[in-house]
Amino acid sequence: MNAKVFVAIAAAALALPASAQVRSGRWGSFEIGAGKYEPDVDAEFATRPGPYEQILGGSGWMFRVGASKAILANDLGAIEVGFRTGYFRKNGNGLIQQTNPDGSTSLVPSGDKTALAIVPTSATVTLRFDWLAERYRFVPLSFYGRAALERYNWWVTDGQGDWSQKGGTNGWSVTGGAALLLDAIDPGRARELDNDTGVNHTYLFFDVTHAQVDDFGSSKSWDLSTKGVSLQGGLMLVF
């Protein structure tokens, strides 16, 4: 190579800001999402439908937000510890006892409104595998697994909006998920976003969670475990 050409290329490279040459360091991640959730409150009742199903119906939307700090990160992925919270609310009508024509009794919906609200809080450990998405942009998928200790803070309101019951139930959860790397759509814009804001990557994620939230098997607590599994999707930023 001509010496003058080599010097010109080297000078141009040195003139670039460091942020344009090297991706910013990895601190952690932030995510926001939502998914269907149905607590297994009726599990203790032999008859169907149980009180929850009669009063509040089936599943509802639970919204979640979380942030994690990477304690170990390399080319394969990262291990993160973090915190998540969210909100769930389901409205319904209370039940009253009705006497049937044959003399038997049954519970039927009344005109009194009621609601169950839950604020879940989670202490999480997440293992992320980003190597495929980082190395092969034609396979822009990242995978992750998460374990968490859970506390679901809940309350029930009456027709006037006052709390009639409240409490907290502890437990655990496990999650497995996949995330689609949106950087692959426009790598140039992704680099600009990293340079300007420090956001390394943007993902759309989808995951499956099983939560066992029953005070570790206590018969005295409400069972707020997921009925089967819950599905969630959302947006995740890695920075």
Residue ranges and their predicted role:
Residues 32-34, 63-69, 83, 121-129, ...:
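Residues on the lipid-exposed face of transmembrane beta-strands in outer-membrane beta-barrel proteins
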Residues 66-159:
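Gram-negative (and chloroplast) outer-membrane scaffold detector with strong preference
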Residues 26, 57-63, 115-121, 141, ...:
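Residues that define the transmembrane beta-barrel architecture of outer-membrane proteins
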Residues 46-55, 106-115, 157-167, 218-222:
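Extracellular loop and loop/strand-boundary signature of outer-membrane beta-barrel proteins
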Residues 21-27, 70-79, 130-141, 183-202:
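Short loop/turn motifs that connect adjacent beta-strands in outer-membrane beta-barrel proteins
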Residues 1-25:
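Cleavable N-terminal export/targeting peptides
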Residues 23-25, 179-239:
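Predominantly the C-terminal beta-signal and adjacent terminal strand-loop region
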Residues 20-72, 215-225, 232-238:
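Short glycine/proline- and aromatic-enriched beta-strand/turn motifs that initiate or cap beta-hairpins
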